[in-house]
A protein has these predicted regions:
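Flavin-dependent oxidoreductase catalytic cores
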Residues: 1-194
Length: 194
């Protein structure tokens, strides 16, 4: 076989994956419809059956520390029916020795930024423009609230049956992506980017 290593197991930090193939974040049919879990289960189990060692699922949202929800998903993760749908789907995918991760993103306060920049010398176009404009600095309390939100969500996702999470730090200047940039994160407190 030309690419035999792709289908051979690999152990990373004590976790053995059945292959070296992973499935990128995808909705798999989780669209808010009545039959969404049936469609998504067929999709994800097919990916697992065809060799993926890990699938990354889009999940819904919980209210954040300010009581807001992301508009990126129609799934309310605090709904017991939604949680049960994910648990059953994960159980089916696990039958193929495939791990399941959830893609998490913060409910980004779009009116805020990781730090205020007095001068903006970057010439970004298109989709980047709305999110890269100067915005007031996000408070330290809000950052701590976001961290608490992620901890809570990770615990809940583990309880539901997920094996791990992937943090979505998008190309559109999310606070998470900005936080690790020494250019964009000019804070001088403990959340600084230096």
């Amino acid at each position: 076989m030309k690419y035999q290593n792709l289908l051979s197991p690999i152990t990373i930090n004590g976790i053995t994956l059945k292959s070296r193939m992973t499935h990128a974040k995808s909705s798999g049919g989780l669209d808010g419809s009545d039959q969404q879990f049936e469609k998504a289960t067929r999709y994800y189990t097919n990916v697992a059956k065809n060799g993926a060692a890990l699938v990354c699922m889009i999940v819904g949202t919980w209210p954040d520390c300010e009581g807001k929800r992301s508009v990126m998903s129609r799934l309310n993760m605090d709904d017991p029916g939604i949680q049960e749908g994910f648990t059953k789907m994960i159980d089916e995918v696990h039958k193929y020795d495939t791990l399941c991760t959830a893609s998490l993103m913060n409910v980004e306060p779009q009116e805020l930024n990781i730090s205020h920049l007095d001068k903006w010398d970057f010439n970004f176009q298109g989709d980047y423009n709305p999110n890269f404009k100067n915005k007031p600095e996000i408070s330290a309390a809000r950052i701590e609230g976001m961290i608490d939100d992620f901890v809570y969500q990770c615990k809940e996702l583990k309880r539901i049956g997920f094996d791990g999470v992937t943090f979505y730090m998008c190309y559109r200047a999310s606070i998470l992506a900005n936080a690790i940039s020494p250019v964009l994160n000019q804070r001088t407190d403990q959340w600084g980017g230096n």
